[in-house]
Amino acid sequence: MASAAFKETDMAGALSPVSSQTTNSSSLKGLSTLSSKVTSVLSTSYADSEFRDALSLLDSRGIQNTAEARRRLRLDLHREVIDSNGEIIDEFGRVADQLRRIGNTLEKLNNSYAEMKTQVTKAHECTSPVLQEASTLIAQKRQVEIKQRLLKSFSGHFLLPEDEVAILTLTSEPVDDRFFNVLAKARRIRKDCEILLGFENQTSGLQIMEQTSRNLDLAFQKLYRWIQREFKTLNLESPQLGSAIRRALRALAERPSLFQNCLDFFAEARENVLSDAFFTALTGTTSGGTVDHSVKPIEMAAHDPLRYVGDMLAWSHSATVSEREALEVLFVSDGDAIAKGIRSGRDTEVWRLVAEDGEEAPEFDPIKALNELVDRNVSGAARLLRQRVEQVIQTNEETILAYKLANLLGFYRVMFAKLLTEESILVECIRNLEAEALRQFRSLMRDYIANLQGEFQHVPPTLEPPDFLVPSLQQLDAIMKTYETSLTASGDREADFQPILAEALDPFIAGCRNIGKALAPPKDSVFLINCLMAIKRVLMPFDFAKGRVEELGEEIGRESSKLSESQYLFFREASGLAEVFDAVQSLTDKPEDVERVRTLAPLAPAALVHASQRLDDFLPSALLDALENIKYLQDSTMARKITEEAAEKFCLNFEHVEYILMYADESAGQTPQAERSSEDDYGGPQLLRTLFPRTTEEIRVLLS
């Protein structure tokens, strides 16, 4: 680098022989100066940032490392500093000139401001009285305008003009939007009069309230008469309440008595219309005797009693739904407004306050009011429906039809309860009809059972279900299929069906049990199982009979146990081992029990030989003979299972006998392999297993 080279050269020059020769003639002071310079150069740290910056500056200036450059370096640097200072002084001179010009401008502005301030002060002194007078006049004008607006607002808010009073009270004026607007204004005036009554001077408030109340009374009377006329001309075949009459009813709700009178009038008219329509649907003729050829009479089209009742109920349901849809626009959409009007209207009817003294007034429920009105509208048709259905129920002599009628009525009872309420007249009517149909069903069932009392004494020779049970189960199956498709309001269908089973099934089960009591075992159990299995097969497909199916299964299990015990007794007696089983039943492998074996008569050699021979005669046909005992059991799988259980129990007892005989032989010092001499002729201790050679495995094979 240039700076490094410059320094190295400078240092080399300072130490060269030539330099030394030049300074030989110098004084001792010159030598000291040179020495200090060399020491200073050598002590300079190249890590010093300022030193590095100085070297970088020399590099950037492009100075050549010559003797001339080294001599002029300091002079050039001083000249550059002087030139820079001169430029700065020139710039400050120009700044001073600009500041002098700004000072002159500010002086001129101050002079102009002082002159303007003087002129404004003079003008203010001249106009001040005029402005004060003008302010006073403006304030007075503002007060007059406020009083004018207040008077106008008071008159417009608390007073009805003559034309609006005429619209509100005169019957010659129509009930239209203008009427309702004026009515709303009059109601607002009466409410706002309460504010006037709060002042010390109540005269104006009392007068305005009295006049407004009188106009409102006349308006509600006019509205009441108008609604009555509209109801008379309303299309009652399709009672869609228009927006005008709905609005009128909402307004009339502030007079609960008048509102209720209108609803009563409407309900009475609809009751008559629906009664006539139902009669026409039944007979094809109107109540006046006119034939309506557009109607297909239900009485002529429905020859089946069930369809006849179903068509009548379907017509009633359709009419009820139509009534509700037509009226719910008023009670659901406008229910809140009606409820609010009735609440405010109770305070205006003094006689209601007296009648309800000390009692909390009932809250208006739109849905409840709708249900009550619809129920009243169809009450006439409900009475006619009750008469016709009662006639069908009382003339019916078929058990299944009686239940189907009750089930159909129960279905519609649930439907109407969802549509109206449980307390409605129509639902109560159908509930009574359903109860009457069930009474008729129970009566017919009892008559049917009474007619079968003679058949309850006869048992089929094949122990199959008696003749009376088969049609009875077919009848029960039809009843259960009907109930399965029914709509019930209760969540526990099984509990609801128990009374039906008590009437349609329990008497027949009791009859089968009574018949079985006259039979000897095992026929009684076979007969009862056949009957119970037939009943169980009918009940199993239905979920709501699971409890009864389980009860039947338990009873069948008990009877099966009896049959199994009977088959076991047959194996004991027919095999000739009954006495042997009884003899060893209480014996164990204890020495004292084993010693008693040869003292027991059934286990004597001659008795064992006889028992063994009889067992051999029994075993080849034992299983077939046992199955023959219960051959009339219709469930062959159950018969085989019962016989197998009895055979297993027989084998277990036989195995116990086998073990006891083996223990007896061992206690006598003999082994099962010892052979008895043919010359003994039972004279000495005999090998019991030789006398009784059959094994348990052989018995299991022969009885399996």
Curated annotation (Swiss-Prot):
Source species, domain of life: Eukaryota
Coiled coil: none
Disulfide cysteine pairs (residue numbers): none
Pfam families, A to Z: COG6_C, COG6_N
Mode of membrane association: Peripheral membrane protein
Keyword set, alphabetical order: Golgi apparatus, Membrane, Protein transport, Transport
GO cellular component, one term: Golgi membrane
Cellular compartments annotated: Golgi apparatus membrane
GO biological process: intra-Golgi vesicle-mediated transport; protein transport
InterPro entries: COG6, COG6_C, COG6_N
Tagged with keyword Transport: yes
Family affiliation: Belongs to the COG6 family.
Function: Acts as a component of the peripheral membrane COG complex that is involved in intra-Golgi protein trafficking. COG is located at the cis-Golgi, and regulates tethering of retrograde intra-Golgi vesicles and possibly a number of other membrane trafficking events.
Name assigned to this protein: Conserved oligomeric Golgi complex subunit 6
Naturally occurring in which organism (per UniProt): Pyricularia oryzae (strain 70-15 / ATCC MYA-4617 / FGSC 8958)
